[in-house]
Amino acid sequence: MSFTRRRFLQTSSAVAAGAAGSQLLGIRSPFAQDTMSFTPEDGAELRLLRWSKFVQGDETLWMENTKKFTEATGVPVRVDNESWEDVRPKAAVAANVGSGPDIILGWFDDPHQYPDKLVPLTDLAEYLGGKYGGWYDAAKRYGTKDGEWIGLPLGASGARMVYRQKWVQDAGYEEFPTDYQEVLKISKKLKEQGHPMGMALGHAVGDANGWLHTILWGFGGKMVDENNEVVLDSPETVGALEYVKELYENFIPGTLSWLDPNNNKVFLAGELGATANGISVWYAAKNSDDPKLQEMAEDIYHAGMPVGPVGQPTELHLFTQAMVFGYTKYPNAAKEYLRFMWEKEQYEPWQFAATGYISHPLAAYADNKVWTEIPKSMPYRDCVKNMLWNGYSGDLGPASAATMADYIVVDMFAQAASGERSPKDAAAYAARRAERSYR
C-alpha cells in the first residue's frame, strides 16, 4: 500500500501566516488504510532512549503501553530515561559513532543534524497523518526534509504562563495579562508583594528556549529570513533584549543559571508568583501528599503566552520526536513500536494520564477528553497547532539545529539581561555566532 504525499514578510502578517495559519498537513489520502503494520524481524529487541519524566502519568502509561506492545508482538523494549539536557548530545554521539539506542526521542530539529543517519519514516508518518486528521504545520516542518519524513513527531511540552491566582488578583488583575507591557507592570507589582516572577535564562532546553524565542519573535526579531540569511542583529531584536532586561530586574534571583527543573522547584516552594512552564507544576502540586501543595494546586492557573508588538502569537514549545537510527538491526520492529504507541488506543490514554503535558501533533487528538475533563489542561491543547519553529522564518536543517544546540538566542538574552553586554552588543555578538553556522 502506498500513501500520497502531500515571509516574516517584513510585517506581522507573516507571523499570522506562520503561527495563526498553522495548517494541517498530511491530509487524509483516499488510499489510507485503517491500520497498517510492520512485521518485526526475527529475534528483534529494541532499546529506546527518551527524556525523563516531569509528570508521573507520562512515564507510567508509556511503560504500560510498551508492555502491551511486547505482549502483542513478542518484541522486548528496554526504555532508558535521560535528563533533558543530556538527550541531544547522546543522540549526536549515537549518530556519529553508529551505535546506541534503536530509537531516541529527541528535541526540536535534531533529525536535521544527521538525516542520513536515520531510517526514513515516510510510510508510517503518512499513514498516521491520513488516519488522525493530518499533521500540524510545525510537526511536518520538524519531521520532514525534502519531502521525506526523518522523524516522527510526538508533540510538544507546551509553555503557558503558570501563576498564583490570588497573588495576581492582589496585584490588580483578574487573570494573568496577555500584553507585554502589562506583563512588565505585573512583574513589578508581584516583586513588590514579595512574590516575584522568574523564568529560566540558563541552558534550559525547554523553558529558556521557549519563552525567549517567543519574546524575540513577538518584537519582530528572528534568527534568519526566508532566504536563511542571518538577520538577528536588528532593531527588533534589540527591542526584545531591552524588554527582557527590564523584566529581569523584577525576577527572583538566580534565573541566569536555571535549568528546566528549577522553576518547578522554586514555584512549588511558594516563592514564585508566575513563571512560564508546562502543566507539570500544577500536576505535582495536585498529586502531592502534602496538604499545603494540594491547597496550592487550587490556586494555580494557566494562561496563554502573552502577545507582543507584532500582534500575533509567536510561540515556541519544546518539540519532541522519535528518530530511528540507521544502525538498528530491527527497523521494522522499531517502526511497528512507534505505530503502536501513536495509535489512538495508546496515545489518548497516555496523553490523558499525563494531563495534556504533551500537546499532540495530529489534529484528531484535539478531541481527547483530557482537554474537557481536566479543564486546567485546556490552555495547552493547541500549543503545537499554533507554534512556530526554531530557525523561523528560514528552513530547518543543520544550521538551525546547530544554533539551537549552542543556545545562541538564550545566551544573547542572558548577556543583555545580566548586563554582561549591552542589548546592541549582545545582538551583534549573537549574529556573529549564528553566521558561523549559516555560512
Can you name each region flagged by the protein language model?
Residues 40, 109, 280-296, 308-408:
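C-terminal lobe and pocket-closing loops
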Residues 7-30:
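N-terminal export signals
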Residues 146-154, 159, 184-230, 236, ...:
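Extracytoplasmic/periplasmic solute-binding protein
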Residues 40-41, 76-77, 169, 386-439:
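Conserved C-terminal helix/tail region of periplasmic/extracytoplasmic solute-binding proteins
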Residues 36-37, 55-76, 409, 427:
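Short, polar/charged alpha-helical segment
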